[in-house]
UniProtKB/Swiss-Prot annotation:
The active site is at H186 (proton acceptor). This is Chloramphenicol acetyltransferase. GO terms for molecular function: chloramphenicol O-acetyltransferase activity. InterPro entries: CAT-like_dom_sf (IPR023213), Chloramphenicol_AcTrfase_AS (IPR018372), Cmp_AcTrfase (IPR001707). Homotrimer. It comes from Campylobacter coli. Gene3D superfamilies: Chloramphenicol acetyltransferase-like domain. The keyword Transferase applies.
């Protein structure tokens, strides 16, 4: 993993970054429903397949890998890894696990299952220790569907990476859908970029 610093003065987004990070800090969220009928038909495991899909598209586009380092310098990670939540029914709490990413779907599922087997029953917010800097958060709320979802973060204006939240899937008109909320920072990611991400994710889920 590499973190390549951005030359702000020669960056095509300098004006937008200065405005939405400094002058008028702005994050926003968008909630859509994804068609997962093909996943259901093929009998694929839902959660790891969604993690694979989201991470695949993130790694295609810099705007979803742009972050601040420990010194506040803007840069781009060469690769992102998913850091996702698992639920503990007995305590009604959750833990976070991160998994190494590979473009090979079968290999990623194996990595995911190894981490679930090793850390899935561990309590505490971070079940798998030492998450690397190049992780992004994903969570699942499988008990309800939703048409809108928003996170209110006290220090959210300094967080540039995307945040993903899935809901409960449902059947409608003979197809299966799942809600997805994506929260981004306007300083690095515009509506165009979010819509392109969602289009590419849906295309991937259709394959």
């Amino acid at each position: 993993m590499q973190f390549t610093k951005i030359d702000i003065n020669n960056w095509t987004r300098k004006e937008y970054f200065d405005h939405y990070f400094g002058n008028t800090p702005c994050t926003y969220s968008m909630t859509v429903k994804l068609d997962i009928s093909k996943l259901k038909k093929d009998g694929k495991k839902l959660y790891p397949t969604l993690l694979y899909g989201v991470t695949t598209i993130i790694n295609r586009h810099e705007e979803f890998r742009t972050a601040l380092d420990e010194n506040g310098q803007v840069g781009v990670f060469s690769e992102m890894l998913p850091c996702y939540t698992v639920f503990h029914k007995e305590t009604e709490t959750f833990s976070s696990i991160w998994t190494e990413f590979t473009a090979d779907y079968t290999e990623f599922l194996q990595n995911y299952q190894k981490d679930i087997d090793a850390f899935g029953e561990r309590m505490g917010m971070s079940a798998k220790p030492n998450p690397p800097e190049n992780t992004f958060p994903v969570s699942m709320i499988p008990w309800t569907s939703f048409e809108g979802f928003n996170l209110n973060l006290k220090k959210g204006y300094d967080y540039l990476l995307p945040i993903f939240t899935f809901g409960k899937y449902y059947e409608e008109g003979g197809k299966y859908y799942i809600p997805l909320s994506i929260q981004v920072h306007h300083a690095v990611c515009d509506g165009f970029h979010v819509c392109r991400f969602l289009d590419e994710l849906q295309d991937l889920l259709n394959k």
